[in-house]
Amino acid sequence: MTIRVLAICCYLLCIVLFSGCAAGKVSVWREYKVYCGMSSKHGEVSEDAWQRFCDKHVSAAFPDGYTVLDATGYWRSGTDAAAKERAKVILIVAPADAREKVLSVARQYRKDFDQSVVLVSCSEAETVVVSAKDADGK
């Protein structure tokens, strides 16, 4: 009975140790999403204005990179009417201590483009960096 229990424990330990293995370095970071509405009281935010904002604020805060997605946001307005708006979503994968930099970008967007709100979400993200070396199996 003891050998059987020991064998099962070893088997389970191997599963735990090797189940997370993948090519490249694995680390746990955060995935931040900043939802930026493209409408304001003054009209639509132009692509040029958006690009200037990203160049000045987002790229400066996250020089290692970020991703921008085009989106359409839907919500209920204060009058309970359905509303939709063109939007941009900035995806940033960074260490947990980047939270204040992300919030600073969101605050700056809200200020620069007269937004009532800018939504920021954060979730844990397991990241795996796959390099050319890993892809070649070396």
Across the structure, where does each feature detected by a protein language model lie?
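Bacterial N-terminal signal peptides that target proteins for export
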Residues: 1-10
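Classic N-terminal secretory signal peptides
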Residues: 12-14
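C-terminal motif of bacterial Sec signal peptides marking the signal peptidase cleavage site
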Residues: 17-20
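N-terminal secretory signal peptides
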Residues: 22-69
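Short Gly/Pro-enriched loop/turn and capping motifs at secondary-structure junctions
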Residues: 41, 72-75, 97
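Extracytoplasmic/secreted cell-surface and envelope-processing proteins
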Residues: 43, 77, 129-130
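Short, intrinsically disordered low-complexity segments
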Residues: 63-89
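Helix-rich interaction surfaces within compact, conserved domain-sized segments
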Residues: 82-138
